[in-house]
Amino acid sequence: MSVLFINGSPNKKGNTARLASELLDGRAYETLDLVDYKLYSYGQKFDDDQFDEIVSRMKAADIIVVGSPVYWHNMCGSVRNLLDRFYGPIRSGELSGRKFVFLFQGAAPEPWMLEKAEYTMSRFARMYGMEYVGMASNSGEARAIAQKLG
């Protein structure tokens, strides 16, 4: 089973990556650090844009884990930008058959932040046909979701 962790944090070995390693403990997985990719804003068109490469890696995975630190009471810009870019070029249901997990970690995310993030990510997963397994914001939640992944 192929697992892809998309790390939205600019800190490749930070707390978001740590939470992913706790979730995926014992599983082989690939990491895609968004900070290493040229992912332009929705509506911009440049020859060196790597959106298609990111989508291709997502299509090759059976399990997709997206991780974001909490920045300004919300998910980080790189993850938000990735979601925005899906609108239009990617058809509804195009990622069906995959499992999707969201990691959202920060020093002290408030309940309303977690609710908004989970709403957005669960809708994203369903729109593109993925099974939304859940969201983890701490180690205990990550371990519980790991059990659901089997």
Features from the language model and the residues they span:
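Short, glycine-/small-residue-rich phosphate/pyrophosphate-handling segment
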Residues: 96-135
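N-terminal beta1-alpha1-beta2 submodule of the flavodoxin-like/Rossmannoid cofactor-binding fold
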Residues: 1-91, 122, 126-150
